[in-house]
């Protein structure tokens, strides 16, 4: 099976922005791959002038929120690092050897969310009047507002990137089964070892076939 891969534009975020940004992106992806009778729910972001749509499925919301909390906990232990989250859609296939039934996941689409988590700037230690690094509150507030505006624009670009990918890449999407509301998916976050995360992704690609890339 061919596995399509989409690398989303990297976003620079502060730790307090992670939750909203990831909810927006993950729910948007799942919504655009949803099937059957869903109950769309508009969500207005609190930090940005952006509205996105959820499927309205409690199980989906719970699954996404749990992974976001795990990712935030990982970020707290690994500051100043660029991070990647992978949302993978898959089909479940049953293999039936003579003694037992083996369940295999065939990945047909993977989304990579790339974040650069910024650490809040701290004023320099000391009272030297020669220091030019001290920023007055007004200037700091203006810089934060400017950065927030840029992040909002970048987040909108990511949402457009998702919609473009979904509209252009359809041939690899599996047939719809009766009664299915959304395709099975999993969310992978970095582990305590970056190499383990990379090896896990490599194994999935091997099981799914050679992926096609769209930046």
From Swiss-Prot:
Q: What Pfam families does the record point to?
A: ATG101 (PF07855)
Instruction: Name where it mostly resides.
Output: cytoplasm
What does UniProt give as GO cellular component? autophagosome; cytoplasmic vesicle
Keywords on this record? Autophagy, Cytoplasmic vesicle, Protein transport, Transport
Where in or outside the cell?
A: Cytoplasmic vesicle, Autophagosome
Look up keyword Ion transport and say if it applies: no
Which domain of life does the UniProt lineage start with? Eukaryota
Chain spans, region Disordered: 124-147
Coiled coil (UniProt feature): none
**GO terms (BP aspect):** autophagy; protein transport
* Keyword Ion transport part of the UniProt annotation: no
Question: Which family is it part of?
Answer: Belongs to the ATG101 family.
Job of this protein: Accessory protein involved in autophagy. Acts as a scaffold protein of the ATG1-ATG13 complex for faithful delivery of autophagic vesicles to the vacuole. Required for selective mitophagy.
Quaternary structure note: Interacts with ATG11 and ATG13A.
State the protein's name: Autophagy-related protein 101
The organism encoding this protein is Arabidopsis thaliana (Mouse-ear cress)
Upper lineage = Eukaryota, Viridiplantae, Streptophyta, Embryophyta, Tracheophyta
Q: Which gene encodes it?
A: ATG101
């Amino acid at each position: 099976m061919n596995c399509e891969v989409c690398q989303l534009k990297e976003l620079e975020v502060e730790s307090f922005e992670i939750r909203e940004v990831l909810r927006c992106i993950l729910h948007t992806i799942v919504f655009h791959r949803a099937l059957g009778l869903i109950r769309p729910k508009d969500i207005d972001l609190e930090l940005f002038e952006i509205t996105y749509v959820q499927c309205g499925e409690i199980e989906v919301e719970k699954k996404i929120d749990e992974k976001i909390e795990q990712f935030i906990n990982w970020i707290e232990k690994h500051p100043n690092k660029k991070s990647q989250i992978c949302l993978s859609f898959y089909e479940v296939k049953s293999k039936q050897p003579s003694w037992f039934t083996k369940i295999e996941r065939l990945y047909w689409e993977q989304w990579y969310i790339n974040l650069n988590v910024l650490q809040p700037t701290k004023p320099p230690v000391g009272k030297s009047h020669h220091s030019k690094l001290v920023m007055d509150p007004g200037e700091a507030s203006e810089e934060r507002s400017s950065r927030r505006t840029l992040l909002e624009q970048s987040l909108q670009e990511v949402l457009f990137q998702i919609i473009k990918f979904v509209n252009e890449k359809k041939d690899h999407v599996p047939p719809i089964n009766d009664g299915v509301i959304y395709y099975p998916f999993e969310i992978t976050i970095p582990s305590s070892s970056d190499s383990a995360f990379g090896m896990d992704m490599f194994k999935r690609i091997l099981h799914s076939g050679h992926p096609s890339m769209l930046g």
